[in-house]
């Protein structure tokens, strides 16, 4: 009997596959009696189920690598406060590609295996060490997962966030959809600065061609139903703003309810339009009956009721008038208008020490503190403060996050070029929104050649030119 026990106790040492489960089975067989051994086997039989559940975890959750909604929910967990100062190789798109979410400052967590990764970059002067640390973090995005995690072997595909400029039909349908959604905001759309539009090389002719393309796409054609219902707004001013915003990748977030919010579906940036000048606050001349005659600045001031003064300029003038010497003199010399009886009452007023002012009188306190109250008064306006507060124009490019595909060099996938043609094509690549613009203009050009009927083109083009000139007047005033 003793020999049998010794053989049993020695056998685990000789076994090559030593696991906690095997040791438990050997202990139960050699020491515990038969009744308790059965209980031990029952407990041991439950353990493989847990291990099996863990091993089946990749199979159960592997859909996350093919779910676009799950991918962008991970991208949305990154913010500028918790993930700042990272190179493009560690942008949220790359981290979310391998299943990482941002939970704390410079701290990542896997959405499947719950592994943690600290991605802090220490401020060092040695650039080579900095690059080495970045390379280590890039490797850690793939290797820091648990042993049975599926993310290193099956990351998300890049077409989740890439701009598919090689598919013109997809580019056009997405552009028209964004334009239609933005038109629902109507006059709540942000007003665009003429200098910003000019720096983007977007001319009046470009906008006219894009609007013609949208109009042609929305028309019902033979063998094809209309893509959407009629546009929510007929204002050309709304169409121009929505067209430029849609070209730069902006869309409307309907989940926000009544709030006017636009968002970027790529970098998950959300912008509240109440912080910017809106079309309803810009006083443009709506009389577009004579598009052929140019409008001079003098005519623009005569036609506009207030000579086209921006809200920020009105606030500046009101503050200048309030802080002028005449205004301050009138406020500080108001004590001269008191009657002799009132002056005597002021001199006989008891000294107020509750505020620690010593021997200063109450009138002295009021006069001494009035300049501070005047400085704060513009911020204590009534409900009209939202109409007169200085608000800047919306820049459709700078409002994107720095790693957004719309404002970075487009990297198209699925190209058929080979050899030196790949390098030549990569050299010609431009920003994402410009690549989309090329595709849209090429599509519009092909339709114009096939259908030369452009009877309504000159009238709409002149109206677009007219609005662009009015935007230029707004920028110069």
Curated annotation (Swiss-Prot):
One of its GO terms (biological process) is cell division. GO terms for cellular component: nuclear pore nuclear basket; nucleus. Residues 354-363 have a biased composition (Polar residues). Residues 382-392 have a biased composition (Low complexity). It comes from the Eukaryota. It holds the Pfam family NuBaID_C. Keywords: Cell cycle, Cell division, Metal-binding, Mitosis, Nucleus, Ubl conjugation pathway, Zinc, Zinc-finger. PANTHER family: NUCLEAR-INTERACTING PARTNER OF ALK, ZINC FINGER C3HC-TYPE PROTEIN 1. Required for proper positioning of a substantial amount of TPR at the nuclear basket (NB) through interaction with TPR. This is Zinc finger C3HC-type protein 1-like.
